[in-house]
Amino acid sequence: MTDETLRLTARITGVVQGVGFRYWTARKADELLLKGTVRNSADGSVELVAEGSAADVDSIVKWLHSSRAPGRVENVDFQVSDATGEFDDFRIID
């Protein structure tokens, strides 16, 4: 088992605005003890940045792809890199 902390940067497209997607994503991130942000983008997508253990980052990626995520997720483009440690908690950005 590794203690490596990773950073997930994701762009989620589909019907993901106006359906509580950011709220439920923040709730899931809190459940997984992830730190970062989620925000709506002008193009109708949602941007997610989350840092945490490799297992927790993997869990939120799987959740985003699942039918449990609110709205209708059509695509999740994401990158995983080393965490920066810049976040103290998880926040929804308006």
Swiss-Prot record:
Q: Which residues form the active site?
A: R22, N40
The protein's superkingdom reads Bacteria
Q: Which PROSITE patterns match?
A: ACYLPHOSPHATASE_1, ACYLPHOSPHATASE_3
Q: Which reaction does it catalyse?
A: an acyl phosphate + H2O = a carboxylate + phosphate + H(+)
- Gene3D superfamilies in the record, alphabetically? 3.30.70.100
Return the EC number: 3.6.1.7
Give all residue intervals belonging to the Acylphosphatase-like domain. Answer: 7-94
Q: Which InterPro entries match?
A: Acylphosphatase, Acylphosphatase-like_dom, Acylphosphatase-like_dom_sf, Acylphosphatase_CS
Q: What keywords is this UniProt entry annotated with?
A: Hydrolase
Q: Name one GO molecular function term.
A: acylphosphatase activity
Which family is this sequence assigned to?
Belongs to the acylphosphatase family.
Q: What is this protein called?
A: Acylphosphatase
Taxonomically, what lineage is the organism?
A: Bacteria, Bacillati, Actinomycetota, Actinomycetes, Micrococcales
